[in-house]
Amino acid sequence: LVESEGIVMDRTVSSQYDKMTKTPIEKLIISLGIPTIVSMLITNVYNMADTYFVGRLNTSASGAVGIVFGVMAVLQAFGFMCGQGAGSSMSRKLGEKDIESASYYASTGLAMALIMGLIIGGFGLLFLNPFMRLLGSTDTILPYARQYGMCILIAAPFMTGSCVLNNILRYEGKAIYAMVGLTVGGILNMIGDPIFMFAFHLGTLGAGISTAVSQIISFGILLYMVKTKKTVSKVCLRFVKLSIGMMVDISTIGFPSLIRQGLSSISTMVLNQMAAPYGDAAIAAMSIVGRMSMFIFSVGLGLGQGYQPVAAYNFGARRYDRVKQGMIFTFWLGTILIGIFSAVTFVFTRPLIRLFRDDQEVVEFGFLAMRVQCISLLTQSFVLNASMLFQSCGKRFIAAMMSLFRSGIMFLPLIVILPRFLGFVGVQIAQPIADVLSCIGSIPFVLRFFHQLDKSMEEMNV
């Protein structure tokens, strides 16, 4: 029986290896990218559902969603650090046909994420008021932010854990299973929002409860998918290795994701604080613009996440030609998809903002910001895939630099300086300018790495 199971496992590993290293690159990336794009869009739809339903209450409540978005960004930062770090290392080990090491990375990454979620959730609940203030709450927004944020912090371990399970499935080329878990959670949240908020008369608290419950259910489904042998690598206590070496390895590979998501959280805080002098309507408007921009960005992000396991697997298998070919294909397809969504949003900017909050002041605050963002998002497919390329190939430092560009090095100085000279227009255009500059800054790194891949291929042929 043991021998029979071993033969089945060997066939599974061989089949997975052939799929990731021999399937035509365009077909492979699209097959992995479509479920991930669907997952990302649904995740963003249910985030936007909170914005939509809470927007039915009042402008201050709508602003609270933008404040608590910073909490979710913090949790996702640590969740994706563990998930991307474990997933990238795991996928490269599978490319080398080292299943035991892959299982250690997967199991340890999940354990780290759960522990971090517990710590962040505990401290957040203990210091709830100061935390919400730090994120940019005004006196009128604070009561709503407390209610919504409390629920998110209670569900924190499940949110961070889901990030890892999602990445384990994706990096093994099983994106369809990850899509199921995220989709069910998203649909439940969209159904739960109006029930808890209006049928049970819980308002913002109801939106928080709905989001927390949907996150817990998503975690359960993703864990079930991993535990029912949908993956080659194993996730169990036996493979948890909380040694300094293992945790540092996962953390350093995943560090670019921590930077990307963490700086997104910091950027949201600073953006809210710079918008605060212009009132709750300004905070609500920038929150809506942020959600709409993320919806468009998620199309490219989903496709890029479809490319990640391809890059990691083939880099481990020394198929550098496929790593390079995949990056170029994903960049162009991502730009086209983002362009389509941006064009629609550009044309219907006012009606779309009004859909979330029918307040003329909110619409006017958000109009210019959204339109300029639609144009600048066209540059982000390149930046996004450059960061994912380096992270998947284990190039820690360069991947971290890529992540620093958009939300850190470029954005933070701009959001502090521009409003001093341009007023609220400076708040509106800071992110679009940062997007363009980050794209320009990324180009030399990618060209240099492509040259290194070409050189490695020449040496292998010799």
Please describe what each predicted stretch is.
Residues L1-G33, M90-P157, A199-F255, A311-S376, ...:
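Short alpha-helical transmembrane segments in multi-pass integral membrane proteins
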Residues K22, E26-V45, A49, V71-F78, ...:
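Residue-level signal for short hydrophobic patches within transmembrane helices
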Residues S31-N47, C151, G185, S214-S218, ...:
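Transmembrane helical elements of multi-pass membrane transporters/channels
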Residues M40-N44, A77, G117, G121, ...:
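Residue-level hotspots within the lipid-embedded alpha helices of multi-pass solute transporters
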Residues L41, V45-G63, M132-D139, I195-T204, ...:
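Helix-terminus/linker motif at the lipid-water interface of multi-pass membrane proteins
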Residues S62-G122, M159-A178, A285-T349, Q380-M402:
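Small-residue-rich hydrophobic transmembrane alpha-helices
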Residues V74-A77, N189-P194, F219-L223, F295-S298, ...:
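Hydrophobic transmembrane alpha-helices of multi-pass small-molecule transporters
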Residues G83, I152-R170, A178-N189, A207-G220, ...:
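Short runs within selected transmembrane alpha-helices of multi-pass transporters and secretion channels
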